[in-house]
Every structure is written in structure tokens, then in C-alpha cells.
């Protein structure tokens, strides 16, 4: 899980390692035409990502194929404009969805997975099922009982707290499309909360972000998410009280494997 640190001697070396805007150059008092056109294109891609459609039924099928029991819900949002201007509604289940989950009852296991559209539905369709598949293998090896998965339309991160509480889960993991950036319009994020309940703050969650081809790979993301879930359940806490030392553990394991004898 560890990668060698690349050697950087110039801005050209740095530009090969990141899609960020580095060393653009200039043309008179402005940037070169190509840099301006690239910026305009990336801005358009980010806007398109926010307004992309979400196919909950297709995602439900992918998750069901992984052996999960899947429930579809929606927030109180009633359209994409509503979602953007009323983030509070994206944190609350609509009454019908709430009643349906409450009717399921019973313990939700150690973990409930919530997969929501967020601000980049395309990222969810491109990567969520692959991350979940890799994550399930790690959770099974760790003896962690995974409850049902919930596919949420019009979701903000905190919607997972209400879902986790209704299903009686010890912990909730929310996989959601992140706010598109100019270099990453399809990035997935994971938010992990121990003892979920409505009213929690961001300080009580752990986040694994930038899951996309130029950021964290699906394997790396599953490793980090699995480590945080395991430690959160063992220590009975999450958020600022839980430091992500997953890479330290990976480095230690790598050294042990490479040691002679």
C-alpha cells in the first residue's frame, strides 16, 4: 500500500504528477489560450457533474450482485435545484422512506452502508460498487457484520446518521459523490460515523476523500476505509478522536514482509 516518493526537479516534473494547474505560463498579462480553454472546459465538466442524473435502480442491482440486501430511499429534496439551495433537506429522510426503514427494525449489524448521489452522481456510478466490493472482502476477513445497504437519492452526508440510527447499526459508512473540482469532476468520498444519530457534526466523522483515477485508487480507498471501520468499532469512537494511521500499519507490514528470514 506504500508508494515510492517521486523525485521532483522542476515544474515540468510536478505537472506530470498532478492534474492541478501548475506552471501555466503566461501570454501578456493573462494565461495562454490553451490554459484558458482548458479551464473553461473543466468548469463546464464540473457543472455537468453536479446536474447529472442518478440511477438508483442500476446501483441497487450492482450492490445486490455483491450479496447485499439493498433498500432505496430518498431525502426530502424534490429536485436538483432544491438539493443545491436547501442542503438541510438533503440531511433528512422523506416521511415514506423513514417509515419504511423504521419498519425493518432489528439490529443493523456492525455496519450499514449508505450510497448517495451527492454532488457528483457520476462518481458514484463509476466507483461506488467497485469500492464496496473490495471493502466487503476486508470487512469479512475482520469479522465485521455488515447489515443492509441503502441507496439514497438527494443525499447529503448527514443523511447517513438518520439511516444508521433507524436500522440500529453500530456504525454507518456513507459513500457519496464529492463536490466536483476543476481537475476532478467525478470524485467519490467516504464518511464514517460511529454510533450514528441525527444531530452529529462533521467533527464526529472520519473522511476518506479523492477516490478517483488521479487520486486514491479503489484498492487504496477500501484499505483505508476498512482500517478506519475496524478501529472505530474496536475503540467505540470516530471523528477527530480517531487518527488515520492506516498507512503506518501498511508500511510496517511491508517492512515485515521484506525482512530476511
Curated annotation (Swiss-Prot):
Its cofactor is adenosylcob(III)alamin. GO terms for molecular function: cobalamin binding; ethanolamine ammonia-lyase activity. Its EC number is 4.3.1.7. One of its GO terms (cellular component) is ethanolamine degradation polyhedral organelle. One of its GO terms (biological process) is amino acid metabolic process. The keyword Lyase applies. InterPro entries: EutC, EutC_C, EutC_N. It is found in: Bacterial microcompartment. Keywords: Bacterial microcompartment, Cobalamin, Cobalt, Lyase. It catalyses: ethanolamine = acetaldehyde + NH4(+). It comes from the Bacteria. Adenosylcob(III)alamin binds at residues 157, 178, 207. Pathway: Amine and polyamine degradation; ethanolamine degradation. It is an enzyme of class 4 (lyase). Binds between the large and small subunits. Pfam families: EutC. HAMAP family: EutC. Catalyzes the deamination of various vicinal amino-alcohols to oxo compounds. Allows this organism to utilize ethanolamine as the sole source of nitrogen and carbon in the presence of external vitamin B12. The basic unit is a heterodimer which dimerizes to form tetramers. The heterotetramers trimerize; 6 large subunits form a core ring with 6 small subunits projecting outwards. Belongs to the EutC family. This is Ethanolamine ammonia-lyase small subunit. The lineage of its organism: Bacteria, Pseudomonadati, Pseudomonadota, Alphaproteobacteria, Hyphomicrobiales.
